Regions:
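Catalytic cores of RNA-modifying enzymes
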Residues: 1-233, 276-282, 286
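C-terminal lobe and adjacent flexible extensions of AdoMet/dcAdoMet transferase-like proteins
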Residues: 214, 231-286
């Protein structure tokens, strides 16, 4: 009962805050292109992103909160512990009003997300919910997937083109290294699109929210480094047959030993086949 009362108190305090656009205008807080910032003010959309993550984990980590639109939504939807990682010092000062309203449920860390071990923040289970800077979004995802066991889920916004690559299936035009490495470690699905005009300033592309849920264990047995290596070889020239791409390792004989047709092309193979190649590659490279 006490927890519900505290949630209601925080929700009311956040609802009583001035409109976000008004606060941003008064503070003359402008998005910085150098930081990949695009502010999202629409509470309907930020709430939709927050609800896509429910039920919330013990620790909700937000990367790059900006003026706090999504942060507000997380608190309004009942998140009990939000840790926001932000490198823009202007924003940290601007968000003091939200820290006060959150009544202990919100903590800010001034740090570069690329250098921050977010998998060590708060208490497990953790989840990351973020409108990511597009210029580092893929790098961050791959870094976090190396620590997938430390997370319950990721609800992340990407350029639509990147979202399609993350969620693509064998045979899809977008299927490639990012699809394989992500889905080897997690399930991934596109949840909904957000149009450019929802942001300030509007980007030139449509954005897509993706839900990524780490698997209890990887889809098939192999080392991550070996999987990265064989997918780099296979997709280096994606139109080539695998026997040509792996000529250095024995060509057709190498591919057949993994139980794969040497005439196959990489975009048609399931993840398990790449894992079989990775295991063979590991034996050769030892």
């Amino acid at each position: 009962m006490e927890n519900n009362t505290d949630t209601q108190f925080v929700q009311q305090a956040v609802m009583n805050l001035p409109a976000l656009r008004d606060l941003v205008g008064a503070a003359d807080l402008k998005a910085r292109k150098s930081l990949g910032q695009n502010f999202l003010f629409d509470l309907n959309l930020t709430s939709k992103i927050a609800r896509a993550a429910m039920p919330f984990a013990n620790t909700v980590i937000e990367i790059g909160p900006g003026p706090g639109g999504l942060t507000r939504a997380l608190l309004l939807e009942g998140a009990e512990q939000v840790i926001a990682v932000e490198k823009d010092r202007r924003v940290l000062g601007f968000l003091q009003h939200l820290i006060d309203a959150a009544n202990g449920r919100l903590t800010f860390i001034e740090a570069d997300a690329l250098a921050q071990a977010v998998w060590e923040l708060g208490t497990a289970p953790r989840q990351i919910i973020a409108n990511l800077p597009y210029n580092i979004a893929t790098t961050l995802l791959l870094q976090w997937l190396e620590h997938a066991d430390d997370f319950a889920s990721f609800i992340l916004m990407f350029q639509k083109e990147v979202a399609m690559r993350i969620t693509a299936q064998p045979g899809d035009a977008a299927y490639g290294r990012l699809s394989i490495i992500t889905q080897w470690r997690a399930t991934a699905e596109c949840v909904f699109d957000i149009p450019p005009e929802a942001f300030i300033p509007p980007p030139k592309i449509t954005s897509t929210v993706v839900r990524i849920i780490p698997r209890p264990k990887p889809l098939a047995d192999c080392k991550a480094s070996d999987l990265e290596a064989v997918t780099a070889i296979a997709f280096g020239q994606r139109r080539k047959m695998l026997r040509a791409s792996f000529k250095r390792y024995g060509g057709a004989a190498f591919i057949e030993k993994a139980g794969i047709d040497p005439a196959s092309r990489p975009q048609d193979l399931p993840i398990e086949a790449f894992c079989a190649l990775a295991r063979l590659y590991s034996q050769i490279e030892q």
